[in-house]
Amino acid sequence: MVEGIKLQSVDTGATLVLDMVSTPDYILGSVDWGAVESTHHSFKYVNQIGVYVAGTSLETRSISITGWVIAENETMMTNRKRVLNRFFNPQGAIDVFYKNYVLRFLPNTSVKYSATIADNNEVVCKFKIEGYCPDPLFKEKTESKVAAARIVPMFHFPLVISKTPKPPGGIIFGLRQPSLIVAINNSGAVDVGMKIIFRANGTLSGPSLINVNTQKYFKVNKSMQAGEEIVIDTIIGEKKIQGTLNGVTSNYFKYRDLGSEWLQLSVGDNLFRYDADQNAENLEVYVYYNNKYLEVQECY
C-alpha cells in the first residue's frame, strides 16, 4: 500500500502532497500504479511450429489516484476544490513522486468527484484522478553522476609549507585521475540514454567517449579552449549537442563526427574510455543518467 505521494505540475511547478496521515487538507485514499503491458513482435515461416519473436516493445501505463478533501464548512470545501480544479488539467503533465522515484502522467480528465452526498458534502469529498503515462517507467529522482576524468582537489587547511616538501617539487593542489576507463552501472530494467559533458581545462581537440565492449563511440570534431564545455544528450526524444564558452551557449550539432552513435547505457555494467585527438590530459568527462524501473512499489 502507498501511504504518501507528492504531485508536481510540470508547467507551473505547483505541488500537492497527499498522505494518509500527515496532510490535513487532502488525504490520500489509494494509488493504483497499473502495469506495463508488452507487445511481442513475431513472424513465422510455412510449416513452422510456433513463431519466432523478433522483439518485444513496452507499452504505456495507466494510473489511478483517489483521495479525500477535508474541510470544516462549505466555503472552505469550495476553496479547496478550486485548488484541485486548477491543479489537474489534461493539457498539463504531472510528476508523481513516490519514495526515491518519479513517474510522469497526463490526466485523462478533470477531477472526478463522488456523486453521493455521503462522500461529497461540506466536510468531506472523495475525488479521483486517472492518468496516462506515455513513458511507463519510473525513474530515480536524482541523477546519477560518474566522473570519467576529473581533477581531485588536494588543497586544504591548515596549510603547512615545508622547506623540504615531500614529494619534492612543491605542493600538490590537484591530482588528475590516472585511469582512462570508467565503469558505469545501470541498475534499472532497461537501457537508458545519458548526458555526456566534455569540459576543457586547457586547449584540446576531438574529445570522444568510447564503449569498450561494443567500440561504439561519440566524438565531437572541434578544438576546445580552456573553460569551454560541451553537453551531449543521448536520451531518446531529447538528443542534442550544445557548447558553452564565455557564458554563451551555441548549437554544436554540426561538429558531431559522422560515425558517432547516440550511446546508451545497457542494463548492468558498462565500460567507457575517453580520449581526444590532442591534449587528452586537458579533458574532464562527466556522465549523468537516470536508472529506470518497471515497478517500484514497496511495503508502504
What annotation goes with each model-predicted range?
Residues 95-140:
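Short beta-strand and beta-hairpin "edge-sheet" elements
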Residues 1-42:
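Polar/acidic, low-complexity leader/linker segments enriched in S/T/G and N/D
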Residues 6, 66-114, 271-273:
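Short, acidic/charged, Gly/Pro-enriched secondary-structure junctions
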Residues 139-147:
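Short, charged, solvent-exposed linker or helix-capping segments at domain edges/interfaces
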Residues 50-72, 122-136, 270:
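Oligomerization/assembly interface segments of phage tail-like spikes and tubes
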Residues 2-9, 94-96, 206-209, 239-244:
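Short polybasic amphipathic segments
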Residues 146-300:
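Intrinsically disordered, low-complexity segments enriched in serine, threonine, and glycine
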Residues 27-64:
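Short, solvent-exposed beta-alpha or beta-beta edge segments that form flexible loop/patches at the rim
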